[in-house]
């Protein structure tokens, strides 16, 4: 629910900044929040006399879910999902798909074509670390535009991991936009994160989101500071802050 609120309010700001008319107002968002009922994963909920709903982890972003509708007395089972991710990440478990029965599936199709074969995670991480090291060792600054929800937190974990291991050159990492707000929400719901990350947040002093490498740029007047300084650094920013 907090993540939904953050994303919807940000959408209003982005739309207005583009000179367009938002399709809903802040008042609409607050009204939706008051009328929203949250459901945990894996719980059967009667949403009408003959339809039952079960939400399951979609593996996309924090709180994302697939919707399994059991219609009638077992007459039909329908699954709807938006974005899904089958691979387990450093942040979330892979999407749940172990449904007893499914007659109809409505599914998103990003990267769904035969030629949409993505490189392995290790290949991507190796290439990323190599590129960043090249810039930092030359005294440069690395600007990484990224969505604030999901990918930013995953990237934070990658940077923290490789800097601690010595494979990535240590440098200050500045974060802009609503990344910090989204990260705080992740820390507030560790039960929805992968087991290893949940344990780090709850049981140790090794929370990667609180890493010494990260600095949040809170005020617009501070945005130029990382650029003025002559030291190498990494800047992680949402598109609205570029």
Residue ranges and their predicted role:
Residues 129-242:
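Hard-cation-handling environments
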Residues 1-154, 160-167, 172:
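His/Asp/Glu-rich metal-coordinating catalytic cores
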């Amino acid at each position: 629910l907090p993540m939904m609120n953050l994303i919807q309010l940000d959408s209003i700001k982005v739309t207005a900044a583009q000179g367009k008319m938002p399709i809903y107002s802040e008042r609409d968002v607050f009204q939706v929040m008051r009328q929203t009922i949250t459901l945990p994963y894996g719980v059967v909920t009667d949403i009408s006399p003959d339809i039952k709903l079960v939400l399951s982890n979609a593996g996309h972003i924090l709180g994302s879910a697939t919707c399994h509708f059991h219609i009638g007395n077992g007459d039909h089972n329908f699954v709807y999902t938006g974005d899904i991710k089958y691979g387990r990440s450093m942040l979330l478990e892979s999407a749940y798909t172990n449904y007893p029965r499914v007659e109809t599936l409505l599914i998103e199709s990003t990267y769904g074509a035969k030629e949409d074969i993505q490189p392995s995670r290790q290949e991507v991480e190796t290439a990323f670390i190599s590129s960043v090291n090249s810039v930092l060792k030359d005294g440069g600054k690395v600007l990484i535009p990224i969505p604030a929800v999901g990918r930013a937190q995953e990237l934070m974990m990658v940077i923290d991991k490789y800097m601690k291991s010595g494979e990535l050159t240590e440098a200050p990492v500045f974060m802009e936009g609503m990344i910090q707000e989204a990260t705080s929400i992740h820390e507030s719901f560790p039960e929805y994160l992968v087991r290893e990350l949940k344990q780090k947040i709850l049981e140790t002093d090794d929370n990667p989101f609180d890493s010494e490498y990260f600095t949040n740029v809170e005020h617009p007047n501070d945005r130029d500071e990382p650029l003025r300084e002559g030291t190498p650094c990494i800047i992680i920013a949402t598109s609205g802050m570029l």
